[in-house]
Amino acid sequence: MWSGPPQQDEGLPVGLSAISVPWKNLGPSKGNRKSPGGLVEASASWEEAGGEEHPAAAPLDVSRLRSSSMEIREKGSEFLKEELYKAQKELKLKDEECERLCKVRAQLEQELEELTASLFEEAHKMVREANMKQAASEKQLKEAWGKIDMLQAEVTALKTLVITSTPASPNRELHPQLLSPTKAGPRKGHSRQKSTSSLCPVVCPTAGHIPTPDKEGKEVDTTLFAEFQAWRASPTLDKNCPFLERVYREDVGPCLDFTVQELSALVRTAVEDNTLTIEPVASQTLPNVECNNTNTCALSGLARTCHHRIRLGDSDGHYYISPSSRARITAVCNFFTYVRYIQQGLVRQDAEPMFWEIMRLRKGMSLAKLGFFPQEA
């Protein structure tokens, strides 16, 4: 800015010598320069506009403009700073929110992965357990079918045995057809005698054999048959029912009534519980506890050659018995075996054939009690 005093030789007015006009405001561009006459006109316009103002008013206006522009600039700067701070704060909050959401998403993804893994593991576990149960069920089914086949075979064999009415240990005296031809006994026939007195119609039986008639007359006892039918309607092994009570009183009790009463009671209990075992002496090779010698019957106390011995339940003790005692025990066992078959529903016959089989077994007990028994080979 140029503020030097104008020269006097240019003919400028004296009042303009104290005014300093900025070069910028007068348009000092090269193309707009004017003659001193233009300056006079400009100064005149300043005088008309300012009147009698103080010569220092123009610099004050410039300073005011400068201060106001600085204030505006400072306020704008503060406003921008505030807006920037707000924007930064909002951005920080958004960043924190984004970070939190990222953590939540990562946690959810981890939980989802763990849940998927646990579900697959549980599914595999359930499938494995199901396969194991299926395998066990199939194994049990095979075992059950095997047991069923075995039981069916046993039932078929028992039915065949019962239908033929032959007990497990038949009394050969009551079944002469089981004896060998040489021991079957005499047959009915005629023989010439040197004596002319008469003809003997029947050959006399050999000693030790019972004559077996070809035909026997049979008649049903109504009282016994009524008791049997009442028992057959509801089979039981309770010896207090009328049917079994009579058999116990008339056949089982006397047949198992031996001289040694204490051992007789034990034998009777073992027969009723189906826990008595009869063993041949020759087939035993292992040493066991012997309760008597082989030349004395443990039940009768008589000196007899004993080819069998009995064992009561799970006891290790054995008792040698004579052939007569064995026949009596066997007869009672045959009766109880048939009665158990009826109770288990294995006998499919009418009432009368079953009744006569019971009577035949009772007859075997009576004969054994009376001392009749088959001779051993």
Curated annotation (Swiss-Prot):
SUPFAM superfamilies: Sec2 N-terminal region. GO terms for biological process: protein transport. It holds the Pfam family Sec2p. Residues 23-57, 167-198 are annotated as: Disordered. Keywords: Coiled coil, Guanine-nucleotide releasing factor, Phosphoprotein, Protein transport, Transport. The keyword Protein transport applies. Belongs to the SEC2 family. Interacts with RAB3A and IHPK1 through the coiled-coil domain. This interaction is competitive. IHPK1 kinase activity is not required for this interaction. Guanine nucleotide exchange factor (GEF) which may activate RAB3A, a GTPase that regulates synaptic vesicle exocytosis. Promotes the exchange of GDP to GTP, converting inactive GDP-bound Rab proteins into their active GTP-bound form. May also activate RAB8A and RAB8B. This is Guanine nucleotide exchange factor for Rab-3A.
